[in-house]
Amino acid sequence: MATKVTIQDIANELQLSRNTVSKAINNTGVLADATREKILRKAAEMGYKQFAYLPLFQEDAAKTAAPSILPSDKREIAMLTARFLNSSHFSSTMLDRFQSEIDHLHSCMTIHRISLIELKEKKLPSSLNIQRTAGIICFEVFDYDYAQMLCDLDVPLLFVDTPVMDMRPPLKADRLYMENRIEVQNAVAHMVQRGKKRISFAGDKNHCQSFFERYMAYKDAVEYFGLTEGLSTCAMPSGQQNYPVSLYETIRRFKTMPDAFVCANDFVAMDLVKALNELGYSVPDDIWVCGFDDSQEASYFAPHLTSIHIHGQIMGYTAANLLMTRIEEPSLNYRTVYTETNLILRESTGD
């Protein structure tokens, strides 16, 4: 059996610290681009699990690239989003990988923001030329009716996360998610093992399918451990207007505060920590908090935030594969794919 390659093995080969290698592989912290590139190349060369199936060198991949599968009059890959995606969003790393993987198509990637009016009226962004569009990838498109309109375009389509799909007809498109259940349940188990009994959830579970799955994973876990008291102190205000204020007002009304919170994402977690501090509670001394995404901010927020890491590079590679194969074979059955996530323990849970 082949020996499993570890982060320490890569560090030894490059004579770098394990922490430096971990930052490059998990896309956290600040590193020089040359150092990050050197580490990722060595990881691929050594067969590290996260990079073993990626091209070792982009130059080699470009040299051997096949002719474009796209017709000459349809060379645009359109990215649609209903909100601004900043560098803290997991899509930042993912899109870098996605774009590098579709380079051989000789296509251009265009980005289109869906306005509130376009969302309401179920119209495409005015900047999008659908006649020249070979495929569409969607981020933060969580309006179900709008998503259905996109499915009716008869254009190869990939959703990265979706509206909440329970009790609704499935979208006629490929769907890509990060794994939302396993590590949330591991986080709850970790809290229980460390003596936490009243564990609650924070975040709008109906915001998107991933938030819903994270909530259901949390709920299943506390029910499994027989610790359902925390269900009564979940902080789940809905909507995006003044969310930090809504969250603060929600937890301010609690007569009994939980021992710990599992949050829908890191930004909910950070808003929650600030609200708890305003109410006189300390994290982690009084209450533990776990986020999701492992955003750049998680590692330097005070306290350093326990989170669940999304592998953006792997999601980017998978997204490119899903969309390219859909373009090549439009009649394929629709696919739903989940990519691995990992629990990262830090200060906000006493680690």
Sequence positions of predicted segments:
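Flexible loop/turn connectors
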Residues: Y248-D351
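Amphipathic helical "hinge" segments at domain boundaries
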Residues: A2, Y48-L124
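Hydrophobic alpha-helical segments within soluble ligand-binding/sensing domains
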Residues: D174-A202, Q241-E249, A269, I310-E328
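An alpha-beta-alpha
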Residues: Q185-L227, R335-G350
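Short beta-strand elements in bilobed, periplasmic/extracellular small-molecule ligand-binding domains
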Residues: I102-L116, F201, K219-P244
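Flexible loop/hinge segments that line or gate small-molecule binding clefts
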Residues: F139-E183, F267, D293-L305
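Short, solvent-exposed amphipathic alpha-helices that sit
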Residues: H89-L105, E183-N186, Q209-E229, D271, ...
